[in-house]
């Protein structure tokens, strides 16, 4: 089943690249006319705003260590060793570790779960 999926993926990729080359070659041979944007003058005056780098990463974004993640209980989970790391939910112990080691994005308080507390 996996081999069939890989084979179909390769065939689809080859098809996409070949159809893209057909359009490019037709455009270069002046067989297709370029599309003119009606609103191009309207957007010409607007300059693109540069994205400012955040000091911390939200859940699911790339990270290098636990201190890169925004939430107090968020941890940096790495698949395949040190590759493909992203912020995921941690626990109370994660928050305590971050409190001890992080200088930036340091948690002020660690939330405790109410599951283990006795009422009464």
Swiss-Prot record:
Residues 1-16 form the signal peptide. Keywords: Disulfide bond, Knottin, Secreted, Signal, Toxin. The keyword Disulfide bond applies. The keyword Signal applies. GO terms for cellular component: extracellular region. Its main location: secreted. GO terms for molecular function: toxin activity. It comes from the Eukaryota. Contains 6 disulfide bonds. Expressed by the venom gland. Residues 17-54 form a propeptide. It is found in: Secreted. Residues 56-95 form the Agouti domain. Disulfide bonds join 56-70, 63-76, 69-87, 78-85. The presence of a 'disulfide through disulfide kOR' structurally defines this protein as a knottin. Belongs to the neurotoxin 05 (agouti) family. This is U13-lycotoxin-Ls1d. The lineage of its organism: Eukaryota, Metazoa, Ecdysozoa, Arthropoda, Chelicerata.
């Amino acid at each position: 089943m996996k081999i069939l999926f890989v084979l179909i993926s390769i065939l689809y990729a080859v098809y996409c690249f070949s159809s893209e080359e057909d359009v490019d070659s037709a455009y270069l041979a002046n067989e297709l006319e370029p599309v003119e944007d009606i609103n191009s003058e309207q957007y010409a005056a607007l300059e693109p705003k540069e994205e400012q780098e955040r000091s911390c990463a939200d859940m699911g974004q790339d990270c290098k260590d636990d201190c890169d993640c925004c939430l107090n209980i968020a941890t940096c989970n790495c698949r395949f060793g040190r590759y493909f790391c992203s912020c995921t939910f941690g626990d109370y112990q994660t928050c305590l570790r971050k409190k001890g080691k992080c200088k930036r994005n340091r948690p002020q308080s660690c939330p405790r779960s109410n599951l283990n507390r006795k009422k009464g």
